[in-house]
């Protein structure tokens, strides 16, 4: 009996936890989703070495109200601004030609898509309309209370 109750409780907690996470997509997935649901794209431009970026993940994007708001209003994309991902967007291929695999866990070259987004600092969040225009940029670490009104 105790095992059944514990199992049920664990299952419930697991379900609630996963329901409160931002459902990140690739840029390709977000563009495809946007064609169907007409929601803007929310892009979190981060780097692997950025302390405030990690705090944003841990403290802000994990907040149930923030996650719910982002999932409801946007097609969310998590983008490594110094990563090696190739992004096909609006008829153009964006790459990071100077990317160095040996530096993948530290500072690296800036991705071409980062320049397209006009990222000035990390972390940066960009909201993009259906025409591919960045309509709003949010720069720096924000607590849930600070970020929610901007969403």
How would you label these PLM feature ranges?
Residues 1-21:
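Bacterial Sec-dependent N-terminal signal peptides
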Residues 20-23, 35, 116-118, 129, ...:
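Non-globular targeting/processing and membrane-anchoring segments
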Residues 22-26, 58, 106:
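Short gly/ser/thr-rich secondary-structure transition/capping motifs
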Residues 23-41, 70:
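A short beta-strand-turn-helix
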Residues 29-31, 64-134, 149:
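Thioredoxin-like thiol-disulfide oxidoreductase module
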Residues 37-54:
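Short active-site neighborhood of thiol/selenol oxidoreductases, capturing the structured segment around
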Residues 56-62:
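The serine-hydrolase catalytic nucleophile loop
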């Amino acid at each position: 009996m105790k095992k059944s109750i514990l199992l049920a409780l664990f299952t419930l907690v697991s379900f609630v936890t996963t329901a409160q996470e931002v459902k990140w997509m690739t840029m390709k997935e977000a563009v495809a989703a946007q064609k169907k649901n007409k929601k803007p794209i929310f892009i979190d431009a981060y780097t692997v070495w950025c302390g405030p970026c990690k705090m944003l993940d841990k403290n802000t994007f994990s907040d149930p109200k923030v996650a719910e708001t982002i999932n409801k209003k946007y097609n969310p994309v998590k983008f490594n601004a110094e990563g090696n991902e190739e992004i096909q967007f609006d008829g153009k291929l964006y790459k990071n030609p100077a990317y160095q695999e040996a530096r993948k866990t530290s500072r690296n070259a800036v991705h071409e898509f980062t320049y397209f987004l006009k990222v000035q600092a990390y972390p940066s969040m960009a909201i993009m309309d259906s025409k591919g225009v960045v309509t709003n940029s949010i720069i720096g670490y924000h607590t849930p209370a600070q970020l929610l009104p901007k969403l």
